[in-house]
Amino acid sequence: MVLGMSLQTFTFVHVLLSLMGIGSGFIVVFGLLSSKRLNGWTLLFLVTTVLTSATGFLFPVERLLPSHIVAILSLVALTIAILARYRFHMAGAWRTTYVVGAVIALYFNCFVGVVQAFEKVPTLKALAPTQKEPPFLVAQLVVLAIFVALGIIAARRFRSVSMLPA
């Protein structure tokens, strides 16, 4: 039992939060690319992504796992993004700080998604059973390249002073 739920139910909730974070995160990033705040989507993205990272620590394990390290890094990026957006109102350099933090948090969620896909999808598992094989590495490099590009473009295009209505 985790938080009063069976492990299966808790896992379902964790995965649902993760998928909501990824879906809303992409909507937020595409909003950033067109200089739109998308306040509701942003709140959904930030809350579900924080909850995804936080609930990852509640799974019964006996040692610190790589997924915990990613969750810690994600929570750091999310904390910075949340402060930049809501405490510092994206003034000056906080605008870029917010964009970078949000994109990094979404990247970490997608990074773990790729890991999970290679663990759970039989075809992908066959291609990279230990996740040290070229197909896994190529997939992760492609995801990283996409997020680096999205982050750079979003940071250049998102303008807090001349933002369009949400």
Question: Where are these predicted regions, by residue range?
Answer:
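Polytopic transmembrane helical bundles with strong interfacial aromatic enrichment
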Residues: 2-166
